Amino acid sequence: MVEAVVDSGAVHSVAPPGVFPGRVRPSLWSRAGRGYRAANGTSIKNLGEVDVPFATAEGHRCRIPFQIASVEQPLLSVSHLTSAGNMVQLRDTDGTIVNTTTGRSIALERRGGVYIMKMWVPDAAAPLPFGRQGA
């Protein structure tokens, strides 16, 4: 299980290298040499992106592209979520992400002043649920 911090100031959803399984592929920003700026002003290089399939505590199967960079923990961009058709609601003790088309919702936990989304990420080494026909 991976915990991502919901970040209303993040342009992209970003994670440190090695947190998510899968091949890091070049992204628009990594190819253009663009990166990020940390809160203390230091520059952070964009290393590419990983498409992350995951399940939520509610059993929803989701997929989000994460940019890979030397950040401390996975950050989930509110801007990216809302651009993808979701509404993010943050309350005093918790929050939710609601898909405006399907109505599906994902619970967020508020801990230490930040909102956390729990992601159950499949192991890259796990066998696929269906074998290829003729294999």
Please provide the spans of the model-predicted regions.
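Aspartic protease core domain of the pepsin/retropepsin superfamily
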Residues: D51-A135
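Aspartyl protease active-site motif detector
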Residues: M1-Y36, P65-S70, L76-S77
